[in-house]
Amino acid sequence: RRIEVMKHLAMKALIAALVGVLPVSALAYEINDKLSIGGVLAGAYQYQFVDNDENKGRGAVPFQVEMSFTPDEKNEFFAKFGFAAGNGLNDQTSFTLAPWAADLEDDVKDINGRNRDYLLTVWYKYTFRLSEEHTLGFTGGIIDATDYLDENVYANDEYTQFMNESLVNGPHAFVPSYDIGGALEWKISNFSVRGVVMNVGENDEGNSYQFYGAQLGYTLSSPLGEGNYRVIVDRTSKQFLDKQGEDKEHLTGITVSFDQQLGDIFGAWIRFGWQDDKAAVDYDAIYSGGVNISGSLWRRENDNIGLGYSYLNGGNLDIEQTQVFEGYYRLVLNEYLALTADVQYMKDDYKEGSTPEPKGVILGLRATAEF
């Protein structure tokens, strides 16, 4: 018990140090017009009050640093490294979904079973600039498919927006990160097409598999403001066990992800998605959405409030359904540092005769420095 208390105190001290020191020390650093270094350092502490589980709190501190070298407007070399202390509540809670979707300590070690630690991405990109509004780019290396697929202006960043896994990306969409692959980005005026192909080292069953994803997007400018409308389809090779654990099946899914400004103060978003259940899956559908409220409403232009809800329909395993509600207030202290107060309500409903059903509230405080 004393060891656990010491761990909690140490984690709180790390977060306090993050709040107290970073406004002075975190500086954007552009070495020259071709080479730049940036990153994000975050600390979060979450405490759960949950039925059918222990009330407890945990923290984590992830740190990511990235380097970009662009010798000219057509060529770019990029690398990102990730480090973390602690796994937060993610490996402690009985909920199916992670309360914080960040890359934490276990996530940055032996990535995808490749025996690779800390190196998240490293890639080269070449862009054909066919006209002022027409570009075609090709990327190859160790990539993150979520950099190209399932974007959302208001619900896509676990360090500055929602924390819960279901409000960052769709859990049904099985979009992989940090492995070998290539990406295509084609943009003509307001239309865009993106495609991703990846070879992933291993899934939960230890099988290597191929991932294929494509996204069609359109950006609409109207008197309300800018809106982004996307349709994503993805599929894997036949390397995922079925419910009985006997045969291997594909994963196949489709997602729509929309975000729209509603004037200068408000914004709204949705993410709906479905996947087949030939393979064993926790969820076969997600229906999520929310609103963003700019701090301009109370004369703090850089602050914002985010409110989001997700309903996930259970697949062919034990879960009947999961509901998530999350709200946060993000207080921007300066151009580098922001604090977020976060509250989540989660409820897992299981099929008859399954595990006791957890439901409850998770309170969180997150500090994020971007440089």
What are these regions (language model features)?
Residues 32, 42, 188-193, 214, ...:
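Detector for outer-membrane/organellar transmembrane beta-barrel domains
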Residues 291, 337, 358-371:
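Outer-membrane beta-barrel "beta-signal"
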Residues 66-68, 125-127, 183-187, 217-219, ...:
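Transmembrane beta-barrel domains of outer membrane proteins
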Residues 29-53, 161, 305, 341:
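Transmembrane beta-strand segments of Gram-negative outer membrane beta-barrel proteins
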Residues 27-38, 68-78, 129-136, 150, ...:
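Short loop/turn motifs that connect adjacent beta-strands in outer-membrane beta-barrel proteins
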Residues 47, 57-63, 115-120, 176-180, ...:
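Residues that define the transmembrane beta-barrel architecture of outer-membrane proteins
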Residues 42-46, 82-84, 141-145, 198-201, ...:
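Outer-membrane beta-barrel pore domains and translocons
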Residues 92-123, 131-215:
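Surface-exposed coil loops of outer-membrane beta-barrel proteins
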